[in-house]
UniProtKB/Swiss-Prot annotation:
Annotated GO MF terms: ATP binding; ATP hydrolysis activity; sequence-specific DNA binding
Keyword ATP-binding tagged: yes
GO biological process, one term: denitrification pathway
Protein name stated in the entry: Nitric oxide reductase transcription regulator NorR1
Upper lineage: Bacteria, Pseudomonadati, Pseudomonadota, Betaproteobacteria, Burkholderiales
Natural source organism: Cupriavidus necator (strain ATCC 17699 / DSM 428 / KCTC 22496 / NCIMB 10442 / H16 / Stanier 337)
Cystine crosslinks: none
Pathway per the UniProt entry: Nitrogen metabolism; nitrate reduction (denitrification) [regulation]
Modified residues (4-aspartylphosphate): D54
Keyword Magnesium: no
SMART domains: AAA, GAF
Residues where ATP binds: 215-222, 287-296
Amino acid sequence: MTPMYPELLTDLVTDLPHAVRLQRLVSGLRTHFRCGAVALLRLEEEHLRPVAVDGLVRDTLGRRFAVSLHPRLAAILARRDVTCFHHDSMLPDPYDGLIDEHVGEPLPVHDCMGTSLHLDGRPWGVLTLDALTVGTFDAAAQAELQRLTVIVEAAIRTTRLEAEIRALQLARGKQPDGEGPADDGEIIGQSQAIAGLLHELEVVADTDLPVLLLGETGVGKELFAHRLHRHSRRRGHPLVHVNCAALPESLAESELFGHARGAFSGATGERPGRFEAAAGGTLFLDEVGELPLSIQAKLLRTLQNGEIQRLGSDRPRRVNVRVIAATNRNLREHVRDGSFRADLFHRLSVYPIPIPPLRERGNDVLLLAGRFLELNRARLGMRSLRLSAAAQDALRRYRWPGNVRELEHVISRAALRCVSRGADRNDIVTLEAELLDLDGLELPAGSAHHAAEAAIAHPALPTGATLREAVEQTQRACIEQALRAHDGSWAKAARQLGMDASNLHKLAKRLGSK
């Protein structure tokens, strides 16, 4: 081993993007120790999240390793010293099937070592190294890793401090003592599209401007609303989520603004609404385009005056609430056809933020797939679950009309199919492209309407489908056709199907269509 201290120390005093610094760190360690793979994982509650890897497949960055399910990681995390697992260790390796040189195969006899990392006396995460040559991690290598641990922790501390300084500069104010910017964890992606979006969210988060999140169904608008709130000065106050499409028109006013005693039959007492519940914090109006015109007028007055009036009361009440709204509809078109108020649209869209669809996020689809693979692996009790190269290519090529939500369903369905076909849960299970069944989901341009009608008239059912499965597939097709016919409007789709909008939402969630 040649000393790598000069390179590490140079990176500590060089202004580098945090992802670049940590990637250079693990790549340098892999070269230094001449090993097969190195991973840096951050502890987040009961899971370890990879933040930089070298020698592991790309989707590893999207996975979350539950400490309780991975005894090697648990053992490393429990000690302050270096922990070594020799070639005869019986503990399962968390990276089985994920090493670049042996993708999809059980790892050959090999050595592993790792160390826990601490910042300010608290566990931060772990550093792991895997070598495919027995005897690589001898006593000298373990002692070297122990010495390097201090520099690794210093690199992480530098990265954290730089992130805090950037957040302070953007916020133009002081963070509470001992509290850095939240690391949300849920938003997975490294594409330029997602990096630009996160930067834009960071800029607007600490203002009180209304924000309108625009994006297709399934892009994760709620996650981005949560991120906005957590990075705002209101983060210590409630974030209240309102699904506007699920509000029955007769109850919408009471739900949003509250009601006085005797306002209607059954109103036996005072009841605050969602605006008052969000006092000092943020109100997230999801699917805001579904609000009826009568409620739009009252919402506009609240945004203009900062006051609400409970149903049945003539006393105005001041509210201090930031509003974030989201929609998958083209509100400008609805303004033109008179179904959405122009003045409310301009109030809500002070700062519109488009969220990119999954098809525009490049290799992010593989990181997200890694996340869902790990969730299904743990849920199904499997040793290892991964994608073949052909399956990865299929994920990249597919257009993803349902975005991240559809990807989650595709991975879950493929994992279940694999198990139902007799896959041994103790083996490394590889999902092939045909299991994803993306060819059956892809529709030629312009054929969506006819395909939906055909799906209802002649549903394509899996061989041996039960009556319940046939009914559920037909229900899905009916819902999808109604939504397409009404430009994604859940309220109008519910009316076409003869259902209450809230019941349609519940059914769609149960069927996995939402």
